[in-house]
Structure formats: C-alpha cells, structure tokens
Amino acid sequence: MDQNTLIKTAQQILDTTTELSKHLAESDIAIPNDLNVGTTSGLWTTHNAEIEALRLKITGLSQNLGMLLEGPHGFLHEYVSVNWEHGALYTLLDHNVLEQIPLDGSKIAIADLATRVGLPADKLLRICRLVATVGIIREDTEGEFSHTAISETLVKDQGYKSFIGFQTFETRVASAHLADSLRKPNPYWNEGQAAFELAWGMPMYDWHREHPEKGKRFAQAMQSVSKNLDAGNDMIIQWVKGSEGLQNGKPLHVVEIQGKTGAFSAELATLYPNAEFEVQDTSADLISRGKQTLDPELASRVKFSQRDLFAVRKCDEVSDFTDNTVVFLLRGVLWNHSDEEVITLLRSFLPAMEHGIKPIVLISDLVSPIWATFESHVERAFRRRDVTLTTMHNVKQRTSTEWSQLLQSADPNFKVCAFPVDLFGIFEN
C-alpha cells in the first residue's frame, strides 16, 4: 500500500534535515539549538550551494506539510491573519519598545516597559503578547517579556530594523492599493501610476523627501538590504576579482554611474588597492555628501563628479586611461527606467566604447526568472519582487530575454557576456 502523503512528506523533511546536519558537521558549522539572546549560527549566514539547497528544500517541504494539515480554509485564514502580527511588530519598532527590553536576556514587567515608552500598559500587553506568539520576543512569565535572538537583531542592527519598519508600514499601505491601481488602464513606466502613488499621493521617492524621517529610514533600509540580502554587490566584487585586467596587472579604472555617495566604490577601493574609481551622479547633494564621508586614505583613488545620466560619453573621456581597464559600472541603475530610456542610456556609451582601449559596460540589475525555473517555495521570492516593483514604482522586472532584446535594440554590436553565478543566497527580499 502506498505511504500516505503526510508521512511521506514528514519523512522527506527528516531525511533532508539529516543530510543538512551532516553537511553542517562536515563544514564545522554549529547547529543552532535555540533562539536565545546571543545565539548565532553559520547555518543562517552560510550560502554555499549544497547547504542553501537543503535548507530551502526543508522550508518548502515544511510549508507543504503545513498546507496539507490546515486545508484550504485554515491555510487562507492563517495566510491573511499575519497582517495583525505585522501591525503589532511595527508598533514595537516605531515606539522603540524593543530597545527598552534588557539585552542580557532578563525580563521586564509590562508596567515598567509601558512607562519607559509612554504607552498604555493594557494595550502594550496585548501587542507584545501577539508578537511573542510567533517567537520574536518571549513571555515565559505572565506579564514579563524578554528578548530572543530575533528581537535582539532588531535592536543591534538598526539598518535591518529600518528595513522591517519600511516593509511593515509604507509597503503594507501601498500593497492595499494595488487592486485599485488596476481599475483603469495603467501601463508600466511613466505612463501609468504606481499603487504607492495612489496610496500616498505622490511617487515613493518624492514622498520620502517630503517625510525626511521616513526617508532616512528608507535609506538605512536599502543600505542594509544591499549589504545583507542582495547578492548583487558580491557578484560585482567577484567579477572584479576575476577580471582579466586585474589578473594581468592592468589597473582597473571603474566609473560608477549614479553611484550616489560612493559607498560601494569606496568598498571596492578598500578591497582592491591598485584600482581607481570615479563616482558619477546627477545629484550635487549626494556627490557632496560622498566627498565629506569618504575615508581620506581613499581620496587619491576615489573621485567624484556630477554628471547628467543620459549625456553622451565621448572618446576623450577615456583617452587618458590607455594603461587601464576601463569599466562603466551600472549597479541597479536601469531597473526603474523605461525601455526607451534604457536604450538611450546604453547608446550614450557607444562613442567611448569605440576607443581602442575597449571599455566594458558592467551591468548588475534585477532579472525576473522564466516560469518554473525554481521550485515554488524558491520562486516565491522572485515573484514577490515582481509585484513589489509593480506596486511601489509601476516598473516591470525584466526577464533575461527582455534584457537581451533591449541591448540588441540599443546596438546590435553589443556583445553580451553573462557572469556565471551561484543563484543560491539571493532569494530573500
């Protein structure tokens, strides 16, 4: 007789977990036994292909088992009800409640906690209890709360706290307006309107300028995401490490397009002391801030200039670098521009690329995978990003085919070389 699906799925979870534990032991990675304050594990931060694949498989199987156990009504009820947990968590973040809980793992009574943050104790108790039920904080003794490793992260990593705050405030409100944004013809790009704009009355970047406190939080959030969740920067670093120019001893001259304050170029300059960088941006304010915050030791190799994004790049812009490998770096620049704008921008490099030194245009941007590239529990993060870009900016995350078509439309002589990467580790959003 065939084994029932519940037992089969549970056995797959056990078998895969056993295999994962073996890999962790072979890699000398400690297995987390709990989520107490101070707990760390390489399991949470190691993203090699084998470990990540096993971890994701266990997660997917666990989700499947949960759906089988809950059934349609139970699953849907739980799926939508987490909205209330998100609202409760945002309240704790916005009122800095977690910062008032002792980081040494000891408890604090709700009355004391409420006094410290200036909130009514009876309301705060209910909010904390809901957050505790999902394991973010603990209530091991009635009315007394303590940290877990999860809430500890939200206190110690303010950038990540900003990311969670952004996700549980601006994006929640915007996503509630996605349906309304589609009640009339609403094409992508500049001709249409993002759900965020419908919800908040203006485009996201404008809204953050109008609300500088939220704008600062958003900037911190994006910096944290770039550092911790987005593999794009690491992919660029790996490309630079393996670049022909670097291997042959020919110094790199990297022009970072729309490089903002130059934080990433400064990071690259630290890693590669023989390379030099020019950070370009349309914003005089960002360029000024970049100059002010740059490490003085890097000042001779990291330069700044204000420049129009779409201005044509002539041969004389690279003629002084005949002994260098010149790279124009477009890091997350193209995703929010229409096809016409992307083509215009790519064509602006053509005169410079005709120079004998053969400059390179290095593009790191978002790609929407084709259907069924991954298992659904992995694909979910990519589809979430598809909808995120639609909701927040009314832009489309392009497929690899669409990117290739754009490059060919810009100039059929563009030779595209894709950098092979391990996709595991880029699924979080």
Swiss-Prot record:
<dbReference type="InterPro" id="IPR036388">
    <property type="entry name" value="WH-like_DNA-bd_sf"/>
</dbReference>
<dbReference type="Pfam" id="PF00891">
    <property type="entry name" value="Methyltransf_2"/>
</dbReference>
<dbReference type="InterPro" id="IPR029063">
    <property type="entry name" value="SAM-dependent_MTases_sf"/>
</dbReference>
<feature type="binding site">
    <location>
        <position position="285"/>
    </location>
    <ligand>
        <name>S-adenosyl-L-methionine</name>
    </ligand>
</feature>
<dbReference type="InterPro" id="IPR036390">
    <property type="entry name" value="WH_DNA-bd_sf"/>
</dbReference>
<protein>
    <recommendedName>
        <fullName>O-methyltransferase phnC</fullName>
        <ecNumber>2.1.1.-</ecNumber>
    </recommendedName>
</protein>
<dbReference type="GO" id="GO:0044550">
    <property type="term" value="P:secondary metabolite biosynthetic process"/>
</dbReference>
<dbReference type="InterPro" id="IPR016461">
    <property type="entry name" value="COMT-like"/>
</dbReference>
<keyword id="KW-0489">Methyltransferase</keyword>
<keyword id="KW-0808">Transferase</keyword>
<comment type="function">
    <text>O-methyltransferase; part of the gene cluster that mediates the biosynthesis of phenalenones such as herqueinone, compounds that have been reported to treat tumors, bacterial infections and/or mycoses, and rheumatic diseases. The non-reducing polyketide synthase phnA synthesizes the heptaketide backbone and cyclizes it into the angular, hemiketal-containing naphtho-gamma-pyrone prephenalenone. The product template (PT) domain of phnA catalyzes only the C4-C9 aldol condensation, which is unprecedented among known PT domains.</text>
</comment>
<dbReference type="GO" id="GO:0008171">
    <property type="term" value="F:O-methyltransferase activity"/>
</dbReference>
<dbReference type="GO" id="GO:0032259">
    <property type="term" value="P:methylation"/>
</dbReference>
<comment type="similarity">
    <text>Belongs to the class I-like SAM-binding methyltransferase superfamily. Cation-independent O-methyltransferase family. COMT subfamily.</text>
</comment>
<keyword id="KW-0949">S-adenosyl-L-methionine</keyword>
<dbReference type="InterPro" id="IPR001077">
    <property type="entry name" value="O_MeTrfase_dom"/>
</dbReference>
<comment type="pathway">
    <text>Secondary metabolite biosynthesis.</text>
</comment>
